[in-house]
Amino acid sequence: MAFSEDIKTRTMVACGRCCCICHKFCGNNMEVHHIRARADGGTDTYDNAIPLCFDCHAEVRQYDPKHPKGIRFTEKELIQHRDNWYKAIASNGEKEATTDAEYKSVKILR
């Protein structure tokens, strides 16, 4: 299973459609990455999601522990990148829906 559309929307709003690592505006060229892989017990939740550009997503996934070259992104580091970027976006006047109740109260104009 993958992230729900609601979680994808929340992460895109929270990051301003900018990558949480390189901070580049990416528009549609974004992916939501599992901080802890599902294969390792990670979940499809907002807390386990980090929005990344295609390049940073490839970089995060590329590390090979059998041939360690460079320093692997850790879960803790990814969480800090995400949280710091969400705070930076929020300080510019954007307000993310941080709880499910807040998110569900948002009205969609049609």
List PLM regions with ranges.
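Histidine-centered nuclease catalytic patch
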Residues: 3-12, 18-51, 60-74
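Accessory nucleic-acid engagement/destabilization modules that flank
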Residues: 66, 73, 78, 85-88, ...
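Charge-rich interaction segments
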Residues: 83-110
